[in-house]
Regions:
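Conserved ATP-binding TGD loop and adjacent catalytic N/P-domain core of P-type ATPases
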Residues: 15, 25, 108, 129, ...
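Short, solvent-exposed loop/turn elements at beta->coil junctions and helix N-caps
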Residues: 81, 91-101
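Conserved cytosolic headpiece of P-type ATPases
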Residues: 1-7, 12, 34, 38-47, ...
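ATP-driven catalytic headpiece of P-type ATPases
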Residues: 28-70, 100-178, 257-258, 329-337
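Extracellular/lumenal ectodomain signal focusing on beta-strand-rich modules
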Residues: 29, 47, 85, 90-93, ...
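Short loop/turn motifs at secondary-structure junctions and domain boundaries
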Residues: 20-23, 86, 93-96, 132-136
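Hydrophobic alpha-helical transmembrane segments
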Residues: 1-34, 170, 192-193, 201-202, ...
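A short beta-strand->alpha-helix segment at the C-terminal rim
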Residues: 76-87
C-alpha cells in the first residue's frame, strides 16, 4: 500500500485516505459533476436575446445584478459586458441562492438572473429561444425585471477534450458513468450525449447531490464522486470514494479521500488501475507466502529427518529471508505501472 500511495503521488494523485485507494478497485459507478470537471469550467457568454430592449441593456442589467457574485457564470457575464464596453451600474440588496440565481436592486427595480429553478420560483415562462439554445448544450440564464423575463443569456462551457476518452475508458472497464448538474435536463442531456454518458441527474440543487449519491448506493453500487466545488463537498463525503480535482475549492479537497493534482478526468481511470494493480500484488504475495511457508516450515521443523533429509540452520535462515525478499521485490514492480492518463486510456483501447 505504501508503494502504491508513493507511486500515486508521483503521478499527481494524492491519496489522503488509504481505504479510499483500496475501495477504488471495487468502484462500479463514477458520478461526475459537470461544470469544471467534465467541462473546462471557464464559461463564456455566447449569445444574448432581448425582449423589448436592446441586447446591451439586458447584458448591462445582468452584469449589475451579478457584480457581487463569485460564481463562474457571473464572471463570464461581467467579462462579456466589459468586452462590449458596457458601463455596469451599481446594485444594492444583493442576494444569491445556490442553483437558483441572484437578485439585486438596480435603479430601484428588482433584477434577477438565474436558471430554470428561478423561473419556477417566480412562476415565469421561459423564452422560446431557450429551447433552441438548450439543444446546443449551453447553459441558459434568464434575466428578470420585477419578475418578468426581459431577456436570456446563452452561456457555453467547453467540454474538456479528455472527457470523452475518460468516459469510454471507464465504460470499457465495466464502470457506469453518471453525470450530475444543476442545469436544465435538455442542456444536461445534450452534453451527456456528446460524451456518451447514458445516465444523467439534471436540475439537481447543491443540497440534493449527496442524496443522488445515496440513490446510486441503494442500487448496490460502489460510488466514486468526482467534483471541484463547495457544492460538491457533501456528495464527496457521502460517496464510497470522494475524488476532488486539484483546481477544486478547499472545502471539496477537505471532503475527498483522493485528490487529483491536475484537471484531467482520465486520471480517475489511473486511480482505478493503481488500486487494482496494488490488489493483484497483495494477492500474489499472499499466495506466494502461504505456499512457500506450507513447504518450507515443515522442512525446517525436521518432518523429513526420518528419511535423511535435514536442513542446516544456516540454510533455514536463508530460506526464511528468501520469502520476504520475493514479496518485497514483487511489490516493487508496482513502480513500473504507467499511470499517465493518456497511456492508461490508450492501453485499454489497444
Amino acid at each position: 500500500v505504501s508503494i502504491a500511495t508513493e507511486r500515486a503521488a508521483k503521478a499527481g494523485v494524492l491519496v489522503k485516505d488509504r481505504l479510499a485507494l483500496e475501495a477504488m478497485r471495487t468502484v462500479d459507478a463514477v458520478l461526475f459533476d459537470k461544470t469544471g470537471t467534465l467541462t473546462v469550467g471557464a464559461p463564456v457568454v455566447a449569445a444574448v436575446h432581448a425582449v423589448g430592449r436592446s441586447d446591451d441593456e439586458v447584458l448591462a442589467l445582468a452584469a449589475a445584478a451579478e457584480t457581487d457574485s463569485e460564481h463562474p457564470l457571473a464572471k463570464a457575464i461581467l467579462r462579456r459586458a466589459a468586452e462590449r464596453g458596457i458601463q455596469v451600474q451599481q446594485a444594492h440588496d444583493f442576494s444569491s441562492s445556490p442553483a437558483v440565481g441572484v437578485s439585486a436592486l438596480v435603479e430601484g427595480r428588482r433584477v434577477q438572473v438565474g436558471g430554470p429553478h428561478l423561473l419556477s420560483q417566480e412562476t415565469a415562462t421561459a423564452l422560446p429561444v431557450s429551447e433552441t439554445w438548450a439543444s446546443s448544450g449551453a447553459t441558459i440564464l434568464h434575466v428578470l425585471v420585477d419578475g418578468e423575463p426581459i431577456g436570456a443569456l446563452q452561456v457555453a462551457d467547453e467540454i474538456r477534450p479528455e472527457s470523452r476518452a475518460a468516459v469510454e475508458a471507464l465504460r470499457q472497464r465495466g464502470v457506469t458513468v453518471v453525470m450530475i448538474t444543476g442545469d436544465a435536463r435538455a442542456v444536461a442531456e445534450s452534453v451527456a450525449a456528446d460524451l456518451g454518458i447514458e445516465r444523467v441527474f439534471a436540475g439537481v440543487r447543491p443540497e440534493d447531490k449527496a442524496g443522488k449519491v445515496q440513490e446510486l448506493q441503494r442500487e448496490g453500487r460502489t460510488v466514486a464522486m468526482v467534483g471541484d466545488g463547495v457544492n460538491d463537498a457533501p456528495a464527496l463525503a457521502q460517496a464510497d470514494v470522494g475524488i476532488a480535482i486539484g483546481a477544486g475549492t478547499d472545502v471539496a479537497i477537505g471532503s475527498a479521500g483522493v485528490i487529483l493534482a491536475g484537471d484531467d478526468p482520465r486520471a480517475v481511470v489511473s486511480v482505478i488501475e493503481l488500486s487494482r494493480g496494488a490488489y493483484r500484488k497483495m494477492k500474489q504475495n499472499l499466495w506466494w507466502a502461504a505456499g512457500y511457508n506450507l513447504v518450507a516450515v515443515p522442512l525446517a521443523a525436521g518432518t523429513l529427518a526420518a528419511a535423511g533429509v535435514t536442513l542446516p540452520m544456516s540454510v533455514g535462515a536463508i530460506l526464511m529471508s528468501l520469502s520476504t525478499v520475493v514479496v518485497a521485490l514483487n511489490a516493487q514492480l508496482l513502480r513500473r505501472l504507467d499511470l499517465d492518463p493518456a497511456s492508461v486510456t490508450r492501453r485499454q483501447r489497444a
